[in-house]
Every structure is written in structure tokens, then in C-alpha cells.
Amino acid sequence: ADLVFLPIYYTEAAQILTYANRVGYTPKFFGCDGMDGILTVEGFDTSLAEGLTLMTPFDANASDEATQSFVTKFKAKMDGLVPNQFAADGYDVIYAIYDAMTAAGVTGNETAEELCTILEGQFATMSVDGLTGTGMHWDANGMISKAPAAVVIENGVYVPMG
């Protein structure tokens, strides 16, 4: 195969890339957002990820102020660990929930069922700009919609693809 799609998480992907290298198998590898973090796998030869393409809504190397502020604060709290898209997704969803609750005037006196109904209503009509995308919105089933983004690993760093 010329291209191998790996819709798996980064730990397992690192094992596959290591084994492929060991047996001399050199296709182009492509992964999803679960691959974000492959460069941080302990003991993994990150040079094996060179040329790997993956979908991820977050790039810790992005130069915008919001991303750099988040990365700086995250690294300070997490002993220098660089955040991946999972951390950025978590950050975005916390603020999306906060914004939805604020817009709805949630007081804290609502039952869990009432709060769920309120949030469903808010998320059906709101749009969010965050670290992992702009104009993010949710459909009636709660599925998020945001523009896809891809990076390729070059010289050990993520490089956004046009």
C-alpha cells in the first residue's frame, strides 16, 4: 500500500510506525485527531513520524494570542508538557458550557434534567470560537461541526496544511 490510514490513538500508532520501520515498510501514514500526541510517546523515535499527516483541530505552535496564552499556562501547570488537541478540546468545551449557562441565566438551582434541557437549547442555537476552531456549532443530535484541519510532521513539528 502507498497510503496507510490509521484511525487510532497515538500510543498504538507509535507502535505501528516502530514496527513498520523495523520491517522496512515505508508507506505514507495518515491519521485522525487521535494521533495528536504521537511526538510525546515515551521511548518513541519521533523521526519515524516524519511525513506523517494527521487531522487535528489544534496546533500548539500556532502564533495566535489565544493559543499561545493557553500553551504557556498549560505548560506552567503541567511541568512543561505541551498540550495536544485533547487538552484544547477540553478547554473549549468548558468555556462553551460556561457561555451557554451564562446566556441562559442558569442560577445553580436547576435540576439536572432542567440543566440538560437548557444546555440542549443553547447548544442548538449557539456558535463558538475557540482554540480548536471558529464558528463551531452543534446539530440537533449534539454532534459538533467545525472546519477540518490537517498537519504534517516536518522536522519534528506540526506544519499546517493549506
Describe each region flagged by the PLM.
Residues A1-G162:
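Extracytosolic ligand-binding ectodomains
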